[in-house]
């Protein structure tokens, strides 16, 4: 428990001054990525704790049936996280759950699953499907290790692949330096996606994985 709380607090101070000041943080946000391992959960946990530390009532959600990430969400946000599963649930049930649990929240943060468009049958059941169904703006977490301006076409593709989705910005993970981030910020500008901040390389900010997902503190 202490280890995880340390991670939440550390991440919340590393990268959020930009994103916390944007209009997108006033209500709803979905955290997506190009692939698993980009840092969605690390970023989401820090964001939940940062919002909580600002005395905001934050409601976390998780795309898919994952029961491990939701337990981390609860520790970071101070309230139970809710699964939104496009495979097991009807669209009506997902909408009802989302409306019910966001009714008393200042901010709702939904963590995606795998890559943004990855579902059980093409995009069916994907984070993108949940975003489109609930009209939630998307922030992409991008693994910037060993890349710089090459993220521009990636961001452009994610922003334009489905016109009904609203990709509002990107946060970069594993950033080596301010100079590195300047290339990434330029890539965002040229791709038409707002750069919202970054997580620097930091060995302390890592939650080990196991076969069913991220490790829990009691493991």
PLM regions and their residue ranges:
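ATP-dependent carboxylate-amine ligase catalytic core
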Residues: 22-38, 42, 48-134, 142-169, ...
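Internal gly/pro-rich beta-alpha loop/helix module
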Residues: 149-219
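Short hydrophobic alpha-helical runs that function as membrane-insertion/retention elements
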Residues: 138-141, 196-198
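Short, Lys/Arg-enriched N-terminal segments with co-localized hydrophobic residues
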Residues: 13-24
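Hydrophobic alpha-helical signal peptides and transmembrane signal-/tail-anchor segments
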Residues: 1-14
């Amino acid at each position: 428990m202490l280890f995880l709380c340390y991670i939440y607090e550390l991440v919340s101070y590393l990268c959020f001054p930009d994103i916390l000041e944007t209009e997108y943080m006033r209500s709803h946000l979905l955290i997506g990525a190009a692939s698993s391992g980009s840092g969605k959960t690390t970023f989401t946990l820090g964001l939940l704790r940062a919002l909580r530390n600002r005395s905001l009532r934050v409601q976390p959600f998780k795309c898919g049936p994952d029961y491990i990430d939701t337990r981390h969400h609860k520790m970071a946000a101070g309230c139970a996280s809710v699964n939104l599963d496009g495979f097991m649930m009807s669209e009506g049930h997902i909408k009802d759950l989302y409306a019910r649990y966001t009714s008393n929240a200042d901010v709702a943060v939904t963590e995606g699953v795998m890559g943004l468009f990855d579902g059980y049958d093409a995009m069916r059941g994907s984070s993108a499907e949940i975003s489109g169904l609930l009209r939630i703006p998307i922030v992409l977490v991008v693994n910037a290790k060993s890349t710089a301006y090459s993220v521009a076409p990636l961001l452009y593709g994610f922003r334009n692949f489905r016109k009904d989705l609203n990709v509002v910005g990107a946060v970069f993970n594993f950033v080596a330096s301010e100079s590195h981030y300047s290339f990434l910020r330029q890539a965002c500008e040229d791709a038409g996606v707002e750069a919202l901040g970054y997580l620097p390389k930091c060995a302390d900010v890592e939650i080990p994985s196991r076969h069913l997902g991220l490790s829990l503190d009691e493991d």
